[in-house]
Protein backbone atom coordinates (compact mmCIF):
# COMPACT_ATOMS: atom_id res chain seq x y z
CA UNK A 1 0.00 0.00 0.00
CA UNK A 2 1.48 3.35 -1.06
CA UNK A 3 0.21 6.45 0.70
CA UNK A 4 0.47 10.03 -0.44
CA UNK A 5 1.92 12.76 1.74
CA UNK A 6 -1.59 14.20 1.90
CA UNK A 7 -2.91 10.91 3.34
CA UNK A 8 -0.18 10.96 5.97
CA UNK A 9 -1.00 14.54 6.93
CA UNK A 10 -4.72 13.75 7.13
CA UNK A 11 -3.97 10.99 9.64
CA UNK A 12 -2.77 13.60 12.18
CA UNK A 13 -5.30 14.60 14.83
CA UNK A 14 -5.78 18.31 15.56
CA UNK A 15 -6.48 19.28 19.18
CA UNK A 16 -7.65 22.84 19.82
CA UNK A 17 -6.53 24.77 22.88
CA UNK A 18 -3.66 22.46 23.81
CA UNK A 19 -1.42 22.99 25.72
CA UNK A 20 -2.97 26.43 26.29
CA UNK A 21 -6.02 28.24 24.91
CA UNK A 22 -5.56 29.53 21.38
CA UNK A 23 -3.07 26.86 20.25
CA UNK A 24 -4.02 24.21 17.69
CA UNK A 25 -1.91 21.16 18.56
CA UNK A 26 -1.01 18.56 15.91
CA UNK A 27 -1.08 15.14 17.58
CA UNK A 28 1.15 12.83 15.54
CA UNK A 29 0.43 9.79 17.70
CA UNK A 30 -2.50 9.02 15.40
CA UNK A 31 -0.06 8.70 12.50
CA UNK A 32 2.51 6.70 14.47
CA UNK A 33 -0.02 4.12 15.68
CA UNK A 34 -0.75 3.08 12.09
CA UNK A 35 2.01 0.70 10.91
CA UNK A 36 1.47 1.57 7.24
CA UNK A 37 1.69 5.31 7.90
CA UNK A 38 4.80 4.82 10.03
CA UNK A 39 6.48 2.72 7.34
CA UNK A 40 5.55 5.14 4.56
CA UNK A 41 6.87 8.12 6.50
CA UNK A 42 10.09 6.21 7.14
CA UNK A 43 10.39 5.35 3.44
CA UNK A 44 9.81 8.95 2.31
CA UNK A 45 12.50 10.32 4.64
CA UNK A 46 14.97 7.54 3.87
CA UNK A 47 14.69 8.22 0.13
CA UNK A 48 15.39 11.92 0.72
CA UNK A 49 18.63 11.34 2.65
CA UNK A 50 20.00 7.92 1.66
CA UNK A 51 22.75 9.39 -0.56
CA UNK A 52 23.77 12.32 1.66
CA UNK A 53 26.42 10.52 3.74
CA UNK A 54 24.60 11.12 7.03
CA UNK A 55 26.70 9.98 10.01
CA UNK A 56 24.45 11.26 12.83
CA UNK A 57 20.74 11.93 13.15
CA UNK A 58 20.09 14.52 15.86
CA UNK A 59 16.55 14.36 17.27
CA UNK A 60 14.84 17.09 19.26
CA UNK A 61 13.01 16.11 22.47
CA UNK A 62 10.56 14.62 22.55
CA UNK A 63 8.80 13.92 19.29
CA UNK A 64 12.06 13.97 17.35
CA UNK A 65 12.88 10.85 19.37
CA UNK A 66 10.23 8.81 17.54
CA UNK A 67 11.25 9.00 13.87
CA UNK A 68 14.85 10.09 14.55
CA UNK A 69 16.13 6.67 15.71
CA UNK A 70 14.12 4.90 12.99
CA UNK A 71 15.73 7.12 10.37
CA UNK A 72 19.19 6.75 11.95
CA UNK A 73 18.89 2.97 11.80
CA UNK A 74 17.80 3.05 8.15
CA UNK A 75 20.68 5.42 7.26
CA UNK A 76 23.24 3.38 9.23
CA UNK A 77 23.95 6.47 11.34
CA UNK A 78 24.16 7.21 15.05
CA UNK A 79 21.40 8.97 16.97
CA UNK A 80 22.06 12.01 19.17
CA UNK A 81 19.38 13.56 21.42
CA UNK A 82 18.80 17.25 21.99
CA UNK A 83 17.07 17.45 25.36
CA UNK A 84 15.55 19.79 27.88
CA UNK A 85 17.81 20.95 30.75
CA UNK A 86 18.90 18.41 33.34
CA UNK A 87 18.29 15.31 31.20
CA UNK A 88 21.80 14.70 29.82
CA UNK A 89 24.43 13.32 32.23
CA UNK A 90 27.68 14.65 30.73
CA UNK A 91 28.92 18.16 29.92
CA UNK A 92 26.46 20.07 27.71
CA UNK A 93 26.05 23.24 25.71
CA UNK A 94 22.66 24.94 25.61
CA UNK A 95 20.52 27.42 23.73
CA UNK A 96 17.38 29.26 24.90
CA UNK A 97 14.52 30.26 22.62
CA UNK A 98 10.97 31.62 22.51
CA UNK A 99 8.11 29.36 21.50
CA UNK A 100 4.37 29.69 20.95
CA UNK A 101 3.54 29.49 24.62
CA UNK A 102 6.66 30.56 26.55
CA UNK A 103 10.45 30.31 26.67
CA UNK A 104 12.50 27.13 26.78
CA UNK A 105 16.08 25.83 26.64
CA UNK A 106 17.60 22.83 24.85
CA UNK A 107 20.91 21.06 25.43
CA UNK A 108 23.25 18.65 23.66
CA UNK A 109 26.31 16.80 24.92
CA UNK A 110 29.42 18.84 24.18
CA UNK A 111 31.14 15.79 22.63
CA UNK A 112 28.13 14.57 20.59
CA UNK A 113 29.46 15.65 17.17
CA UNK A 114 32.73 16.51 15.48
CA UNK A 115 34.00 18.08 12.27
CA UNK A 116 33.71 14.80 10.34
CA UNK A 117 29.99 14.37 10.98
CA UNK A 118 27.28 14.92 8.40
CA UNK A 119 24.21 15.67 10.48
CA UNK A 120 20.52 15.26 9.83
CA UNK A 121 18.72 17.44 12.39
CA UNK A 122 15.24 16.03 12.86
CA UNK A 123 11.96 17.04 14.49
CA UNK A 124 8.34 16.23 13.81
CA UNK A 125 6.96 19.62 12.78
CA UNK A 126 7.66 23.34 12.66
CA UNK A 127 5.43 25.83 14.46
CA UNK A 128 7.25 29.09 15.24
CA UNK A 129 10.68 27.74 14.32
CA UNK A 130 12.13 28.60 17.73
CA UNK A 131 13.03 25.06 18.75
CA UNK A 132 14.57 24.22 15.38
CA UNK A 133 16.55 27.47 15.31
CA UNK A 134 17.93 26.77 18.80
CA UNK A 135 18.77 23.19 17.78
CA UNK A 136 20.55 24.46 14.66
CA UNK A 137 22.60 26.85 16.79
CA UNK A 138 23.59 24.01 19.13
CA UNK A 139 24.62 21.74 16.27
CA UNK A 140 26.58 24.54 14.54
CA UNK A 141 28.57 25.16 17.74
CA UNK A 142 29.91 21.60 17.46
CA UNK A 143 31.17 22.33 13.90
CA UNK A 144 30.02 19.31 11.87
CA UNK A 145 30.99 19.07 8.21
CA UNK A 146 27.41 19.55 6.98
CA UNK A 147 23.90 19.86 8.44
CA UNK A 148 20.58 18.90 6.84
CA UNK A 149 17.27 19.80 8.49
CA UNK A 150 14.31 17.42 8.32
CA UNK A 151 10.75 17.79 9.55
CA UNK A 152 8.62 14.66 9.43
CA UNK A 153 5.22 15.98 8.77
CA UNK A 154 4.06 19.55 8.63
CA UNK A 155 5.43 23.01 8.10
CA UNK A 156 3.32 25.65 9.82
CA UNK A 157 4.48 29.10 8.81
CA UNK A 158 2.89 30.81 11.83
CA UNK A 159 1.43 29.59 15.11
CA UNK A 160 -2.06 28.32 14.39
CA UNK A 161 -4.52 30.17 16.57
CA UNK A 162 -8.27 29.95 16.76
CA UNK A 163 -10.35 33.14 16.84
Regions found by a protein language model. Give the residues of each.
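Active-site-facing substrate-recognition patch
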Residues: 2-54
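Conserved G/P- and acidic residue-centered "switch" motifs that form tight phosphate/ATP-binding loops
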Residues: 124, 129
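Conserved acidic residues
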Residues: 55, 117, 147
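Short Gly/Thr/Asp-enriched flexible loops that form oxyanion-binding sites at enzyme active sites
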Residues: 66-75, 136
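Single conserved hydrophobic/aromatic residue that forms the stacking wall/gate
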Residues: 149, 154-163
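Short, glycine/charge-rich flexible loops or terminal/linker lids adjacent to PRPP-binding catalytic cores
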Residues: 77-119
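Short glycine-rich phosphate-binding loop at a beta-alpha junction
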Residues: 54-61
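A short alpha/beta connector and helix-capping loop motif
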Residues: 132-153
Amino acid sequence: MIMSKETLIKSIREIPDFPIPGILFYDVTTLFKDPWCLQELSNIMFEMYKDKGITKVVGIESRGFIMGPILATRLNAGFIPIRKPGKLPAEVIEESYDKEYGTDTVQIHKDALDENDVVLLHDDLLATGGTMKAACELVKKLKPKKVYVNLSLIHISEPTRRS
